[in-house]
Amino acid sequence: MEEIIMYSTSWCVDCRRAKQFLKDRGVNFVEVNIDEEPDAEDLVLEVNEGRRKVPTIKFGDRFFACSPFDPYQLSSELNIPLKK
């Protein structure tokens, strides 16, 4: 599987849900907190047409926002099982 990077914040409920969804399925990912990494925040703004949407996920060479959290979207975008 290609590397998954989740751009998130510590206060984001949707980020916590997305992280738990991935952990429950044994999916490895790297988390980048955009409140602590200004360059990462700039990237999130760029790929979301100026919107600060978290979580934003990079999978391979493409980005998508999963905000609000949608397990069906996350499962489909990453090609992982919906059910544990």
Model-found features: residue ranges?
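Thiol/disulfide oxidoreductase modules built on the thioredoxin-like
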Residues: L45-K53, F64-F69
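Local sequence-structure signature of Cys/Sec-based thiol-disulfide redox active-site neighborhoods
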Residues: M1-N28
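Thioredoxin-like thiol-disulfide oxidoreductase module
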Residues: I34-R51, L78
